[in-house]
């Protein structure tokens, strides 16, 4: 009974987790990624995005791929962290590697992050735990504000990760001049 209660509690906490995550970067009707420490010049110059994760976070990446490619007109590849680590594939040096991990301690994701950094590729972490290994080692960090997630089945962390990725897609589209000011404003209205 305890696990069911915890899961239900976390399901009901999803709206707050999403709103807190959105409020961390949306100020006065615009997305402000200064806390993530990514510049508009960097956003303009990325040629590709790799999204690397495991489990449910990988599913967030799959959904985000469609939004990023559609809105920001940038090529996106989603990779399981274990595959990213061991496959021999050419990596675009002008890419951004986004790793997603609720805990910030997922072993394969951390190893993939380290590999990307060794290759000289800019990295960004989307994590829920401040001070986690992945957060400390990534070049840029977008914190989700879902709070602790006790239930095995992810709920609020998953939803907050989706919200974070949508914010990135909208801001990349705006900075890369792929959407109009009106489309940008409407996108923010839809998620707020």
What are these regions (language model features)?
Residues 1-5, 191:
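Short, small-residue-biased leader/transition segments that mark boundaries at the very start
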Residues 16-26, 30-31:
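Edge strands and adjacent loops of beta-rich recognition modules
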Residues 29-44:
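A short, well-structured juxtamembrane/interface segment
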Residues 44-185, 189:
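Glycine-rich phosphate-binding loops that contact phosphosugars or nucleotide phosphates
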Residues 9-10, 21:
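An acidic-aromatic substrate-binding cleft motif
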């Amino acid at each position: 009974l305890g696990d069911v209660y915890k899961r239900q509690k976390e399901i009901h906490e999803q709206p707050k987790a999403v709103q807190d995550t959105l409020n961390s970067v949306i100020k006065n009707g615009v997305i402000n990624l200064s806390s993530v420490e990514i510049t508009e010049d960097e956003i303009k110059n990325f040629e590709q995005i790799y999204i690397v994760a495991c489990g449910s976070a990988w599913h967030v990446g799959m959904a985000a791929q469609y939004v990023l490619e559609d809105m920001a007109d940038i090529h996106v590849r989603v990779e399981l962290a274990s595959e990213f680590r061991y496959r021999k594939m050419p990596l675009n040096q002008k890419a951004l590697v986004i790793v997603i991990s609720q805990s910030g301690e997922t072993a394969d994701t951390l190893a993939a992050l380290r590999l990307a950094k060794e290759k000289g590729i800019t990295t960004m972490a989307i994590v829920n735990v401040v001070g986690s290994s992945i957060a400390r080692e990534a070049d840029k960090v977008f914190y989700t504000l879902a709070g602790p997630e006790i239930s095995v089945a992810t709920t609020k962390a998953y939803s907050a990760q989706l919200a974070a990725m949508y914010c990135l897609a909208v801001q990349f589209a705006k900075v890369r001049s792929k959407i109009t000011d009106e489309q940008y404003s409407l996108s923010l209205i839809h998620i707020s």
